[in-house]
Amino acid sequence: MESFMKRAMLLLSSTAAVALSGCSESADEADSALTEQVDSKPETVVSPISGTESIDAGLAVGDQAPMAAGLLTDAGETTLGKILENGPALVVFTRSVEWCPYCQTQLKSINAIVDDLKDRGYNLYGLSYDSPDKQDRFAKNQMLQYQMLSDQPSKVIDGFGLRDPQYTDGRAVGVPYASVFVIDKNGKIIAKSVSGNYKKRPSNEQILALVDSI
């Protein structure tokens, strides 16, 4: 009888161990699947702008940019005039580094053409109405090789005539049309592209072609 009881206890222990092992494997598999779902989340796709989506908004080619309007960077206060002392600029106006996935995708993408623009004689900048802290955090996380400019409260955006008028309430008030402006060292606008659809922005190839057309 005692021998039978020992065998029964051993059998129960083995069954419990197998069950616990199965639970552990199931939990591990669930964690692995969850990780794969998070890691495989697709990035927002930004489509290239077409001729029909380009709009005539903001300052025109040949106009003077608002040189004295204040901007903020992670290093402190500056102006467009001071920035242009470093050479001609290509400025990408974007809605928000914080909540606009199309903007985030574009800002990461143009990192690839920093050197191409420098070879053509232009410094690249991104501009949004976000605070310098938010821009700096995004820039460091994405290892951006160009400077972000903070335009609070959208004075430069307004100076360029780029405020998107459809937003009159909520966090999007003050955002610009998704735009690219090329400015010479004297502050004259020498090329531009303004999109009427924030989901569509100039591709890197289109940006370089815009510069090459000058």
Predicted regions and their residues:
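Short active-site neighborhood of thiol/selenol oxidoreductases, capturing the structured segment around
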Residues: L80-Q104
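Thiol-/selenol-based redox modules, centered on thioredoxin-like
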Residues: V173-I214
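Bacterial signal peptide processing site
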Residues: C23-S26
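Structural micro-motif
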Residues: Q145-Y146, D164-Y167, V173-F181
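Structural microenvironment flanking redox-active thiols in thiol-disulfide oxidoreductases
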Residues: P101-V156
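N-terminal "domain-start" segment that seeds a small globular fold
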Residues: V45-K82
